[in-house]
């Protein structure tokens, strides 16, 4: 089957309060900085803002729900989302309430991106969740969310969670709850997307790998006869650096991502990042679009203090080169 993809390309920005890059001096998140950042992203014409999630990470990171609630006060236009939230680490009951609340506070401009995690096993240890249960917990948690979001008297009996006759009010602003997108490229992950979710969020893949992932989702959805009544969005989180030369961009990306992930990221940066002059970066984005990506989330890499300049530079020098895709007929 063919997935019901729109034609228009949307662009998002990853990260609000997060210090994961080499920087100067101590990192103390500031409200004024968040306000300026969200205003800048809105003014530059991007479509969305996203934050990641870790309970215990190599470098400082704040809770995504609290960041988004703070950011949503600043813009009445932008869509906000988690990219991605490690749902297996939490009980889905309180999460259902938090998401319903966020959806109302954002007036229905929220997308819930989820993932299984696993790269940092200590997160699972501190949350008391066996690492080998993360996939099964995610699947069941998604079912619990949808059940509670009906706003009706709900019952669920599963492997991990059990309740009977629970009514959670109010339900989310968006009928049926906000769209849920999921990351992952394993066979289990793509089958989960095909069966239960409204979108796919890829990460650290090439355009060819992206296309293969979408094909697997389409085949799995076709095998069970799923119609995607709410539509389907194919998205990609893309590490990006616009610079004077490809080599300068590669050096900045390597240093930044090696710090973030505590490993040598040079070869991965060469393969998976969009780097170089504006034309080179745009060409990479176009290849992802041709592979089926319709929402590209830009994670600008480089020194933390440069992110305002990176957001402005991309908007001024790269977005105009993508206008044909951004105004494509839906």
Where are the regions a protein language model picked out?
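Flexible, glycine-rich active-site loops centered on histidine and acidic residues
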Residues: 6-29, 88-155, 203, 208-212
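N-terminal small/glycine-rich loop or linker at the start of catalytic domains
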Residues: 1-25, 118-122, 159-177, 246-272
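Short, acidic/polar
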Residues: 28-41, 98, 182-192, 277-287
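Alpha-helix-loop-beta-strand connector modules within alpha/beta enzyme cores
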Residues: 62-82, 137-144, 312-330
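Conserved, mostly hydrophobic/aromatic
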Residues: 41, 45, 53, 71, ...
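Hydrophobic faces of well-ordered beta-strands that scaffold small-molecule active sites
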Residues: 11-15, 49-51, 80-82, 110-114, ...
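N-terminal beta1-alpha1-beta2 module of alpha/beta enzyme domains
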Residues: 1-74, 178, 301
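Active-site mouth loops of central-metabolism enzymes
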Residues: 17-32, 85-92, 174-185, 240-241, ...
